[in-house]
Every structure is written in structure tokens, then in C-alpha cells.
Amino acid sequence: MTLKITRRAYAEMFGPTTGDRVRLADTDLIVEVERDYTIYGEEVKFGGGKVIRDGMGQSQRESKDCADTVITNALIIDHWGIVKADIGLKHGRIAAIGKAGNPDIQPGVTIVIGPGTEIIAGEGMIVTAGGVDTHIHFICPQQIDEALNSGVTTMIGGGTGPATGTYATTCTPGPWHLQRMLQAADAYPMNIGFLGKGNGSLPGALREQIDAGAIGLKLHEDWGSTPAAIDCCLGVADDTDTQVAIHTDTLNESGFVEATIAAFKGRTIHTYHTEGAGGGHAPDIIRVCGESNVLPSSTNPTRPFTVNTLDEHLDMLMVCHHLDASIAEDIAFAESRIRRETIAAEDILHDLGAFSMLSSDSQAMGRVGEVILRTWQTAHKMKAQRGKLAGDPNDARGGHDNFRVKRYVAKYTINPAITHGIAHEVGSIEVGKWADLVLWKPAFFGVKPSLILKGGMIASAAMGDANASIPTPQPVHYRPMFAAAGGALARSSLSFLSQSAAQAGVAERYGLAKTTAVVRGTRAVTKAQMIHNDWQPSITVDPETYQVVADGMLLTCEPAEVLPMAQRYFLF
């Protein structure tokens, strides 16, 4: 016997299905479900009088044949698709994406539910991969809570705490600091990788940092990003299969942008804040996003371009780079980095896929808890100003924005993971990867997640009063969960190491409790591997007006006066 119900009734019961559309938060972005992996009439749902009961949707099978956890009827948004499915987790990893249930009585089951299976209700929820923030100044450990509760589950960068060098540069310099920071990372429910200091013209002091556990090296102008240092650093990276990130020479002291590009010698490099307000050759560092070997990212204070963007940057610069407002040269240095024309162009270069990643620059001209939020604000602003992308349809119902959404979600998930050699572990919702997953109510998408899973276990959640009779009474705020406690923390999160450090037994020598994973495959990555974000335009910047032209097209847009995902979400 079959029962027909309306689409609305179905969506309210089991979540949206193929062809249904969902608005993301209060933006203009609409996604359409491309495929539903569940089977109509055989959906599983937990609760009184529902499906997942003994002998019904739950089988009698032992745990070895069943998922540890199933997220039911979830709307997955990832770079590879926007689909409805059940998600099975096993041993902290994603085991299957498909149809959950009891194969003894149900057809098409690919994820077995048994007595040993926990259920997370995904009906009406969106699931994304945990974010990967690759521009972290480890100034204070409290950043980790802020990042985790925003949906970021991996942090890559450098620092040693509130030291002057760390305020300005993402470097954990030298073997001693790397050892101590890796030991400190054991205490936090976050995947973490550290970058050593890459500014040196001889390889010895750089190589020893990789051997001590750094997963890459950071070149920063405050330490001297000279052509010699760039060349040496990239040579060490090639020898060790690690990545290099660079903040180039704003003052053009040791050469202009052409000299820096020449020093790259075609080798892969991750350019931080490639627009330049965060630092880099003034006024035309933005040119490098057209190079095939350059993997360009933005930091979030310029995302998106608004009426307030320019005003806040000067004070941020003075603090972060240890400048003195009484020195005219320091003021000139700061002002040279803040250009409305290149910031406006950055919006468009993101929308067209020339800028491949987005990160925070935490407490050093960026906000660690706003990577995801500002990514989607940028996507909204570009749709509002530029209309639909060529890859998105426009029909009688107004069409959808699936391609644009895939482009933007890739900027803080899979592309930074590919860039830093960790995409075999994290960065997407794919079978075999670490189960770092974020669940959102659509109305709060990109702003306030409901659950954050680390390694298949809930690490943080928006939770009500712990003394209440039910979980929902106020005050509801983010609270650490069991994956953030005791021995579970070490098994639920990763510390990333270089291959040479892993082979040398660094984890055992340092006494690390956390699960370790190695970075690999960084040196062969090119812009072409940046998913949905691989455009390589030829860019020129007018040295007088700062106007940006890409492949003959003038890139300009107005600053936003009002944004979604803003004050209405943060009244309490």
C-alpha cells in the first residue's frame, strides 16, 4: 500500500528531497537537492512510533557489521554535490553515504543500523564538512573554541602565544617551539598543523623545523621575504613535500612583484591575503592569482567589501605590525596596503573562481570565528550585484545557486585541504575521511551551527541549561561535549606532521597523545587542482588609480551597505 503526501508534508517529516529548494540563512542563495539517496517509503527516522526500532529499521546485527553513528536524511552541501542521504560513521571516519536501515526487511540498504548504532536526526538539517582555516596566528588558545563553534575543525598556521612575532607572523620558529606547541595541541579538540619560519637563505635552519614537526614553512615580510629567502624556502619544501605560505614584500624593498614571481621559479606556493590589504607587494600583489603555480587565498577582514572595510583597516595594521602612529613612514606603510579598488576586485575574483581559498588571519587583522560567515556573505553580495553565475539555471521558479554554492564551500573546505596536503584526511564529506562534520539548521546556516562532530563524536553543540528538564531551555550557548574531554579528545582530533617528522618518531619522542597524520602531495598541486576555483586570468593594476583589469575586464563593484547573516543573528 502506498500513501501520497504533499512535498511540504514530506519535507517537514523527512527533510527536502530531489527538486526541493532551500534558502541558506537570510541570504539570496538558494540550493536545490540534486539527488536523494534514500528510498521513498523506506526512510529511517528515530523516535517514539517511528522507524528505527528493533525488528523494523534496526537490525539484529553486531557492531562489526553496523555503523557506529548514522546521521539520517541529511542535506549534504559539499564541493561534489548537494544531495539528500543518510551518512554512516565508523571508527571515527565516514563509512558510507547512502541509504540506512535494516537490510533484513528493507531494500537498497547500504548502511546497516543495529543495536550498537547511535542516531543523529538530520531531517531538515544541512551537513557540511568541517572548515579548514589555513591562516592562523596562534596568539591565544581561546581562538580554538571560537573557531570550533563556528564550524571550523582544522587550523593551520603558526605562533607561540602573545609574542610580538606571533602578533604579526604565522610562524612557530625552531624545533623547541614546535615541540612545545605540538604538546599544547594535545589539549584541544581541533585538528592542528604548525608552520615553521621560512625566512632564511640557507636550508639547514629551515629543514630542521620540518624534521621537528612543522607541516610547512611561512615566509613573511616582517622577517624579510627576499628573493633569496623565497628560493631557499621553496627548495626545502620541494625536498620535504611540504607547503610554503607567503606574505610578500609590501614596501617592494627587495624587488617588485615580478621579482617575487621569478623567485618562485614555477614552484607551488600558497599566497596569503592575495589582494594585499593584509600585506604584500603594493599595489599589485593581486596579479599573482593568475599564475598556475600560485594557490591564492583571502583573509576575512576584506570579505566582503563594505562601507566599513577601509576605515577599520588602518588601526588593525598599526597594532598587528608593531607600527608607530607618530612615525610618518609607518603611516605611509599602512596606507599603501589599503586600496578600495583592489578590495572591490577581490570580491569579483572570488566569484569568478580566481581566488581559491578563504581564511581568517586570526587576531592579526582577521576574525577566527567568521571564516564561514564571511564566505557566504561574499557569495550573497556577488549574487545581489552580479546576478547568477553561468553555471546556475534560471527558471520559472527563479532557479538555484548550486554552482555558486559549491564554488564558495570549496574555498574553506577542500581547497585549503588540497593545498596543505591533508585532503586525504579532511576537507570534504567523502568515504574514508575523518568524520569532521557540521550540522546546521538552514535558517542559521553559516552563522551558528547546531552540532560540531570531530572524528565521529560530538565535540561542541548549542546546548541549553544543563539543569533543565529538557535540553532546549535558555540560556542556549556553545558548550564543550564529550569529544572534547579526556582520552576521547586525543582519539577524535588530529595533529598533522611532516613525513620526515613522522618517520623520525617525533610523536613518541614528544609524548604526544593525539592521533597524528602526515601531510603529503603538496608539491605537485597547481591552480588547476583548486576545485571550482581554478581561473587563471591575466591581471594588470594601474599604479596610479589602482584599477584592476582581468583578461581585459575592469573589475569593480560597490561596497555593501547592508549584509545578511549579521546583526539579526547576534542580538543574544
From Swiss-Prot:
EC number: 3.5.1.5
Protein's pathway: Nitrogen metabolism; urea degradation; CO(2) and NH(3) from urea (urease route): step 1/1
PTM statement from Swiss-Prot or TrEMBL: Carboxylation allows a single lysine to coordinate two nickel ions.
Binding residues for Ni(2+) 1: H135, H137, K218, D361
Domain Urease: from-to ranges: 130-572
PTM annotation (N6-carboxylysine): residues: K218
Listed CDD domains: Urease_alpha (cd00375)
Molecular function per GO: nickel cation binding; urease activity
Entry coiled-coil feature ranges: none
Residues that, per the record, bind Ni(2+) 2: K218, H247, H273
HAMAP family membership: Urease_alpha (MF_01953)
The protein, known as: Urease subunit alpha
Source organism (scientific name): Ralstonia nicotianae (strain ATCC BAA-1114 / GMI1000)
Lineage: Bacteria, Pseudomonadati, Pseudomonadota, Betaproteobacteria, Burkholderiales
